[in-house]
Amino acid sequence: MEALQHQPQNITLEQYEQFPEDYRVEVFDGAIYNMSSPSQAHQTILTELLVSLRSYIKEKGGSCTVFPSPFDVKLNDDPLTIVQPDLMVICDKNKLDGKRCNGAPDFIIEIVSPSNPSDDYIRKLY
């Protein structure tokens, strides 16, 4: 994940919402970070985990929902922090507003990429 040359450095939610839908970024403490496209191996792992989690929740009669990335999670307003974990489970439907999850999901999975392990192990430990 590389920092974009984008102003202002302390981006607001209103500015974030003006980005095109296919503009893949995360915002940490108001700073914008570009997200690279996932690899085939990454997507294969994501799909297997998604199917397994969804099946397990249904089998146990759970009411939680599994969401794959890209799906925004807003963790903070000022400074803005919006992330897109690779996979998340959300049980509290009140956190969902039709656009994103507001607050921490109940469970997240981040698939570590060889191209950016420091981001996955350090910055993304929100």
Regions of interest found by a model, annotated:
Residues 1-126:
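Gly/Pro/Ser/Thr-rich low-complexity, intrinsically disordered segments predominantly at protein N-termini
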